[in-house]
Amino acid sequence: MDNCELVGSRIRLGLDMDGVLFDFDSKIMDKFAEMGIQFTDVKEMSSAVEFDKSIKQRHREIYHVPGFFANLPPIKGAVNAYKYLKSLTDINNNKIFEIFIVSTPSFRNQTCCIDKINDLNKYFGPELLEKVFFCRDKTLVNLDILIDDKPEIRGFNGSSECLSDSNSVTNKMSFQHIRFHSDMYKYSDDVPIINNWIDGTYIDVVKNVCVDKNLLREVVV
């Protein structure tokens, strides 16, 4: 993004944790395997959760167990992607992003929040701990962009499914929702989506959204 210039102040970029920074689904599959329930991949588990009520109930019970969120492994490339985004500057050498963590806690899991804090500290460092939001309604958080694996972010201030259609409902959400691909969900074809943190394509996705939302402008040198 060295050919871009910030239009205003630093861009407030929110990152979800489960399924975006940390491999939530692989640990769920491991717990199912301990019960003798084997899935070949996340897609197979997703289908079972969707169509089998008993599997859906067990899926919920797994992450409600205290300690589940402790020592979740980071998704491949997530740590390096965070460091890269944090380091980016524009043509005037201004830092582009101020990065926040926005995560939904499991209130039935008494150790959820402290386990997530420890995971962040272990892999992403103590600096990020000052910028963590645990909240049930992410639409209330004042961001420019939120990267989240959910197909839709819905809450008091509206729905990210409606942001492209101004005639549908009144939206007060401050941020553009970028989806991070998960085989647990199905996504529309017309939404910005990041498929992984490894191959570098996420950079163009984020840049294009920033330009489209007039947060960055491209400069011809």
Curated annotation (Swiss-Prot):
- Superkingdom field: Viruses
This protein's record includes keyword Hydrolase: yes
> Which of this chain's residues are annotated to bind phosphate?
D18, S103, K138
UniProt keyword terms in alphabetical order: Hydrolase, Magnesium, Metal-binding, Nucleotide metabolism, Nucleotide-binding
Q: Which Gene3D superfamilies match?
A: Deoxyribonucleotidase, domain 2, HAD superfamily/HAD-like
Quote the PANTHER family the UniProt record gives: 5'(3')-DEOXYRIBONUCLEOTIDASE (PTHR16504:SF4)
Q: Which family does it belong to?
A: Belongs to the 5'(3')-deoxyribonucleotidase family.
| Protein name from the UniProt record | Putative 5'(3')-deoxyribonucleotidase R824
